[in-house]
Amino acid sequence: MSAEEQEEGGATPAEVIEVVGETGMHGEAMQVKCRIQEGENQGRIIARNVLGPVRVGDVIQLRETAREADSIGGQ
């Protein structure tokens, strides 16, 4: 981990490019597609589940960029 990552607690910024939909038992989480802005996965687009209000253009901090959320309603 670099010195910058240690200062930020290991978080990596990612920009929300699409809100896919609501997920969770009561719709409390949103599934979004986001583009990683820094690090070894820079430029990669991944799906993640996010708690709280989020919209396109927001920058979220991800602790881990290797894991991706399952698609909503996947059978």
UniProtKB/Swiss-Prot annotation:
Gene3D superfamilies according to UniProt: Nucleic acid-binding proteins
Keyword Ribosomal protein found: yes
Domain of life (superkingdom): Archaea
Keywords tagged on the record: Ribonucleoprotein, Ribosomal protein
Xref: SUPFAM superfamilies: Nucleic acid-binding proteins (SSF50249)
Example of a GO biological process term: translation
A cellular component annotation (GO) from this entry: cytosolic small ribosomal subunit
Pfam families: Ribosomal_S28e
Parts forming coiled coils: none
GO molecular function: structural constituent of ribosome
Family, per entry: Belongs to the eukaryotic ribosomal protein eS28 family.
Protein name, as recorded: Small ribosomal subunit protein eS28
Organism: Natronomonas pharaonis (strain ATCC 35678 / DSM 2160 / CIP 103997 / JCM 8858 / NBRC 14720 / NCIMB 2260 / Gabara)
Classification of source organism: Archaea, Methanobacteriati, Methanobacteriota, Stenosarchaea group, Halobacteria
